[in-house]
């Protein structure tokens, strides 16, 4: 798991050296605001795009232009964020994802985003600036996820181009603290989501119940989390017949994983998250169709979400109590597999 590096800089967008300058633009019928100055530098290229309806700031719209040496960044990428009254962190997140993907597809190594439009958008709305700044970082980081763990590498082949760094440009020192806080929070969210994606992306012969249990133990050691894993004998004593029944056709032992995070007084009732962890579901005796069965490795997506959520809750140091439970097993057909109609004890 490799995450894009995200930082901030107190700098003027047109004077900042980067491969691509990204400007979030609200929906408009014509060029307005700071775009006027840039449009003049680019000989009216932006105005022409507005007139031809190639770009107008609508959500999801993009316009990539060569700046021809008129500014420090050789390329300018405009990304639409929709009508000014309808701008939300979610829309900013989506716009950032769109821009980041296009920047990477264009083989840019670095990019910078101007946050100055957020000053006006968040005026009179406490905390909104930080939410919008965080949404930029989060959207870019989540969009640029890659899972290359099992891809062979040929020395003759060029490495895939990756956008390695995103700089958030701020116009005032007063925004530094909130922007830094927003970046840090976004990076924790990105890391947790990447954890879930990685677990789901690995094949079934890698992610077994034991693998999930080991992952949980390792995560607990590096976070403020306690971890307890129940094995087959402990589950038998507790009468967990359903989970044991699913697992009895497999050579892989089942595991019941319990993670506990206490960020509030222990007497406060916790939120409990339960994640399904069937690391491969063949259907057992009632075998599923062969076509697409490889996707049954994803029957543990609930467990991946639970583990990632516990990671995030701890890293954010939330002032609440959360318990995560994962029932992990492998469902395989064999002479010892559970049969339809069996009574479980």
PLM regions and their residue ranges:
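Short amphipathic alpha-helical segment within the helicase RecA-like ATPase core
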Residues: 2-277
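A structural-propensity feature for long, helix-poor, extended segments
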Residues: 326-328, 333-345
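Catalytic-core environment of secreted peptidases
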Residues: 258-298, 336
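Alpha-helical metal-binding/catalytic segments enriched in His/Glu/Asp
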Residues: 216, 271, 287-330
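Conserved protein kinase catalytic core
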Residues: 86, 287, 333
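Short flexible/disordered coil segments
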Residues: 120-122, 191, 195-197, 232, ...
């Amino acid at each position: 798991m490799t995450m894009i590096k995200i930082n901030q800089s107190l700098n003027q967008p047109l004077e900042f050296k980067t491969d691509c300058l990204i400007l979030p633009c609200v929906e408009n019928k014509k060029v307005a605001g700071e775009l006027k100055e840039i449009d003049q530098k680019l000989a009216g290229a932006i105005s022409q795009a507005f007139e031809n309806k190639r770009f107008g700031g609508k959500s999801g719209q993009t316009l990539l232009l060569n700046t021809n040496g008129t500014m420090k960044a050789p390329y300018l990428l405009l990304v639409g964020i929709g009508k000014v009254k309808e701008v939300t962190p979610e829309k900013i997140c989506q716009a950032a994802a769109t821009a980041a993907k296009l920047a990477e597809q264009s083989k840019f190594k670095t990019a910078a985003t101007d946050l100055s439009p957020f000053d006006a958008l968040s005026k009179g709305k406490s905390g909104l600036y930080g939410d919008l700044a965080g949404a930029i970082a989060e959207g870019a980081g989540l969009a640029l996820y890659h899972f290359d763990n099992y891809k062979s590498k040929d020395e003759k082949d060029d490495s895939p181009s990756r956008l390695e760094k995103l700089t958030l440009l701020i116009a005032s020192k007063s925004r530094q603290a909130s922007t830094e806080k927003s970046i840090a929070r976004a990076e924790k969210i990105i890391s947790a989501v990447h954890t879930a994606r990685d677990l789901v992306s690995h094949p079934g012969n890698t992610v077994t119940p034991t693998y999930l249990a080991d992952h949980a133990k390792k995560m607990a050691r590096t976070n403020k989390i306690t971890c307890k894993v129940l094995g087959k004998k402990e589950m038998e004593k507790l009468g967990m017949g359903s989970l044991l029944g699913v697992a009895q056709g497999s050579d892989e032992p089942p595991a019941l994983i319990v993670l506990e995070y206490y960020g509030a007084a222990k007497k406060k009732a916790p939120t409990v998250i339960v994640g399904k962890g069937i690391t491969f579901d063949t259907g057992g005796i009632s075998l599923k169709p062969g076509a697409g069965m490889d996707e049954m490795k994803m029957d543990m997506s609930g467990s991946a979400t639970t583990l990632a959520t516990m990671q995030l809750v701890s890293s954010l140091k939330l002032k609440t109590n959360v318990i995560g439970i994962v029932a992990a097993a492998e469902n395989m057909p064999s002479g010892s597999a559970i049969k339809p109609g069996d009574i479980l004890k």
